[in-house]
Design a protein with these regions (language model features):
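Conserved active-site tyrosine of GNAT-family acetyltransferases
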Residues: 1-2, 6, 155-156, 160-161
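Acyl-donor-binding surface of acyltransferase catalytic domains
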Residues: 1-33, 167-172
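A conserved beta-strand-loop-helix scaffold within acyl/acetyltransferase catalytic domains
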Residues: 58-116
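A short beta-loop-alpha structural element at the N-terminal edge
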Residues: 34-49
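Extended non-membrane alpha-helical scaffolds
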Residues: 85, 135, 164-168
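Conserved beta-strand-loop-alpha-helix junction that forms the acyl-donor binding cleft
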Residues: 144-156, 162, 167-173
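Conserved acetyl-CoA-binding loop-helix of GNAT-fold acetyltransferases
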Residues: 117-119, 123-136, 140, 148
C-alpha cells in the first residue's frame, strides 16, 4: 500500500456484533429508575445535558442557539426512530442514562450509538438496562443482529463478540 501512496493512520475501529435472538432481554427493574423513549421535541435540552454529562464534559452544558440547533439536526436524522432511543429517568424525572440504536427495516441489523450514563449513576446496571430495552425494541421490529464500534468490556459482558477490526490508511497525494 505504501508503494501506492497510502500511509497508515493511527486511527482504528473495532466492531463488535451481538446476535439478538441469542440474548435474554428480561432484566430486573432497578428501583427508582424508569425507562421511556425519547420525546425529541419536548426533551431536547434534557437530552443534550445528559450527553454532556454522560461523556464526561466539564461544567455546564452549552445551551446557546448554535449548539441547540446542532442537537435538533442530530435528532432529526432521516432514520431516527424515537422508539429506539431509550432514556432512563430517576424519581425526580431527570435523565440519567441513554441509548440510541438505529435500525432501517430494509436491513437486518441494528447499530448502537451512543450509550452513556451520568457519572453519579454509573455501575448500577442502568446502561445495560437502556441498551437491552433499545435492542429488544429493535428486535421486535425485525433486527437480527447488532453492531457497535467499541472495544469496551461493557459490551462484551452483555455478549457482543469480535466481528472485525479496521485500520485506516490515508492517500498521500
Amino acid at each position: 500500500m505504501k508503494d501506492n501512496g497510502f500511509l497508515k493512520n493511527e486511527q482504528t475501529e473495532n466492531i463488535l456484533e451481538l446476535k439478538l435472538d441469542e440474548i435474554n432481554f428480561n432484566l430486573e427493574p432497578i428501583n427508582g429508575i424508569t425507562l421511556e423513549n425519547i420525546d425529541i421535541k419536548k426533551d431536547l435540552y434534557k437530552h443534550h445535558e445528559l450527553l454532556w454529562k454522560g461523556f464526561n464534559h466539564e461544567g455546564q452544558a452549552p445551551l446557546d442557539e448554535d449548539t441547540i440547533n446542532k442537537q435538533k439536526l442530530m435528532l432529526s436524522a432521516p432514520h431516527l426512530n424515537p422508539l429506539l432511543h431509550v432514556v432512563a429517568k430517576n424519581k425526580c424525572n431527570e435523565y440519567v442514562a441513554y441509548c440510541g440504536v438505529w435500525f432501517n427495516d430494509k436491513t437486518d441489523y441494528v447499530y448502537v450509538e451512543p450509550v452513556c450514563t451520568i457519572p453519579e449513576y454509573r455501575n448500577k446496571g442502568i446502561a445495560r438496562m437502556v441498551l437491552m430495552e433499545a435492542l429488544k425494541r429493535a428486535y421486535d421490529l425485525g433486527g437480527i443482529k447488532s453492531y457497535v464500534i467499541s472495544d469496551s468490556n461493557f459490551y462484551k459482558s452483555i455478549g457482543f463478540k469480535q466481528h472485525s477490526h479496521y485500520t485506516f490508511y490515508w492517500h498521500n497525494r
